[in-house]
């Protein structure tokens, strides 16, 4: 991400976030990460960039920063195109597995109203667990085959679980565990690192160019960017998960995508979700 933007410089994002090594180092070789300070700076930047926008509105992505698109979005949401996915997801969520158990048996509070707590760091395995990964691990523990991650039943089940959490703010925790801090730093590094033939980073579009138009689309701010997933996108003609969108982003910058639920993507989701703590869940959502 270029650091020639006065607004970015004022928010100290370039200095604070880009002073990162290109390759991972043990935490003892670096200044100890401070995710809370990062989050305050991250949110302060977007609040200064869009001073009239309440924090909760960032959940609505491009519709929060473009009045014309918002009118179209409000019209579409009179008959949400994701309703079919909610119905399918609820049915799948409540249908018992062959052993008689359900998805609810795998999650706190029977899986209702918990989307805002994911991704979570699993101290037993030392890795980040996204909601989608937790759904498939639940299936496997109960003798079922895992679902494909990008669309289909996975998107529908995740959509239903998100809908039960609608309005609850992200509440991602980063425990005082060196492995959790390394996962957070890895996700942060991914977000700010340039890649692909176009030499773009995630931040190039969703920090520096947030709210601007590119190829006919309004670029959503990074703050709250995951709050509305899974999404119904017009260009997909159907539902898609975070993995589907990350794969598409990689293709757009002409970079080789990672496999769905690769550690790199999970850590990126961990970073972005933690940066969005306080932004309410608004999924499932719609996008152009």
Predicted regions span which residues?
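N-terminal secretory signal peptides that target proteins for export/translocation
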Residues: 1-6
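Low-complexity, intrinsically disordered segments with a bias for serine/threonine
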Residues: 8-9, 28
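Electron-transfer interface patches adjacent to heme c in soluble/periplasmic c-type cytochromes
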Residues: 30-84, 95-156, 163-167, 173, ...
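Long, positively charged binding patches that form subdomain-scale interaction surfaces
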Residues: 185-190
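Sec/Tat signal peptide C-region and signal peptidase I cleavage site
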Residues: 22-29
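Bacterial N-terminal signal peptides
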Residues: 9-21
């Amino acid at each position: 991400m270029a650091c020639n933007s006065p607004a970015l410089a004022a928010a100290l994002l370039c200095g604070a976030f880009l002073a990162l090594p290109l390759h991972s180092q043990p935490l003892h070789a670096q200044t100890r990460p401070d995710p809370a300070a990062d989050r305050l700076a991250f949110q302060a930047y977007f609040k200064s960039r869009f001073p009239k926008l309440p924090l909760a509105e960032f959940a609505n992505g491009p519709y929060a920063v473009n009045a014309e698109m918002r009118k179209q979005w409000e019209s579409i949401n009179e008959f949400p195109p994701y309703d079919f996915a909610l119905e399918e997801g609820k049915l799948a969520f409540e249908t018992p597995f062959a052993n008689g158990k359900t998805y609810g048996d795998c999650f706190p509070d029977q899986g209702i109203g918990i989307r805002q707590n994911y991704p979570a760091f699993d101290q037993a395995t030392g890795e980040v667990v996204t909601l989608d990964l937790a759904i498939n691990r639940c299936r496997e523990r109960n003798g079922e085959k895992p679902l494909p991650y990008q669309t289909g039943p996975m998107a529908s089940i995740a959509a239903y679980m998100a809908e039960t959490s609608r309005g609850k703010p992200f509440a991602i925790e980063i425990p005082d565990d060196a492995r959790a801090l390394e996962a957070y730093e890895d996700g942060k590094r991914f977000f700010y690192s340039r890649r692909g033939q176009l030499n773009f980073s995630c931040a190039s579009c969703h920090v520096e160019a947030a709210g601007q138009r590119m190829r006919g689309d309004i670029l959503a701010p990074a703050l709250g960017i995951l709050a509305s997933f899974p999404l119904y996108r017009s260009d997909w003609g159907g539902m898609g998960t975070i993995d589907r969108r990350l794969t598409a982003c990689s293709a757009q910058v002409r970079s080789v995508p990672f496999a769905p639920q690769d550690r790199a993507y999970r850590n990126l989701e961990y970073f972005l979700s933690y940066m969005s703590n306080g932004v309410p869940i608004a999924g499932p959502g719609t996008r152009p």
